[in-house]
Amino acid sequence: MMFNRITRSAGLLARARPTTTAVMSPMTPLAISRRGYHEKVLDHYNNPRNVGSMNKNDEDVGTGLVGAPACGDVMKLQIRVDDNGVIQDVKFKTFGCGSAIASSSYVTELVRGKSLAEAGKIKNTVIAKELSLPPVKLHCSMLAEDAIKSAISDYNSKRKTKNPTLGAEAAETPAAATATA
């Protein structure tokens, strides 16, 4: 009799384990969609665009590294800018939730081909609206906005370091030409 109870008990435990395992298994796209993620988030999460990195020491590359202490998301976004101030290439690496990855992926598509001034005006509300992010995930779109602004700032600081007196030289050039004439 005791043996039967143990067997039954073990049988119940064995049946309970797969349910527990299924709950703890990695999330499939179907499981994610049940949680209410918009199809655009799922698309950018499952097929992220422009993942990678560039050499941060290149003078035409700006790097933005931002994080959200509340949730642990970290986003690195890099831009490559041509001589006309237009973003030619964009790469990102994000460690975080699906919404953070989707926000990063989307913003890389958004800024490519834009001038630095245009890219600097991008607001998180545009990103959040496009991806239909719920209020609890708005910080992900804020990270993307902060990352692009940080990358632009890094690029601009490299340009100033490379040519610290560019403005002064440009101002002196006409005067020097007049003085020698």
Swiss-Prot record:
Q: Which InterPro entries does the record match to this protein?
A: ISCU (IPR011339), NIF_FeS_clus_asmbl_NifU_N (IPR002871)
* SUPFAM superfamilies (UniProt xref): SufE/NifU
Entry GO CC: cytoplasm; mitochondrial matrix
Annotated spans, Disordered: 159-181
Query: Which cofactor(s) does the record list?
Result: [2Fe-2S] cluster
Alphabetical list of Pfam families matching this protein? NifU_N
| Predominant subcellular localization, coarse grouping | mitochondrion
Keyword annotations for this protein, in alphabetical order, are: 2Fe-2S, Iron, Iron-sulfur, Metal-binding, Mitochondrion, Transit peptide
Q: Which pathway does this polypeptide act in?
A: Cofactor biosynthesis; iron-sulfur cluster biosynthesis
Instruction: Name a single GO biological process.
Output: intracellular iron ion homeostasis
Which residues are listed as membrane-spanning? none
Tell me where in or outside the cell this protein is found. Answer: Mitochondrion matrix
Please share the entry's free-text remark on the cofactor. Binds 1 [2Fe-2S] cluster per subunit.
- Specify residue ranges for compositional bias: Low complexity: 168-181
Instruction: Please indicate which superkingdom the organism of origin belongs to.
Output: Eukaryota
In alphabetical order, the GO MF annotations are:
2 iron, 2 sulfur cluster binding; ferrous iron binding
The family classification in the record reads: Belongs to the NifU family.
Quote the NCBIfam families the UniProt record gives.
iscU
**Its job:** Scaffold protein for the de novo synthesis of iron-sulfur (Fe-S) clusters within mitochondria, which is required for maturation of both mitochondrial and cytoplasmic [2Fe-2S] and [4Fe-4S] proteins. First, a [2Fe-2S] cluster is transiently assembled on the scaffold protein ISU1. In a second step, the cluster is released from ISU1, transferred to a glutaredoxin, followed by the formation of mitochondrial [2Fe-2S] proteins, the synthesis of [4Fe-4S] clusters and their target-specific insertion into the recipient apoproteins.
Whom does it interact with, and what assembly results? Component of the core Fe-S cluster (ISC) assembly machinery.
Note the PANTHER family from the entry: IRON-SULFUR CLUSTER ASSEMBLY ENZYME NIFU HOMOLOG (PTHR10093)
Name of the protein in question: Iron sulfur cluster assembly protein 1, mitochondrial
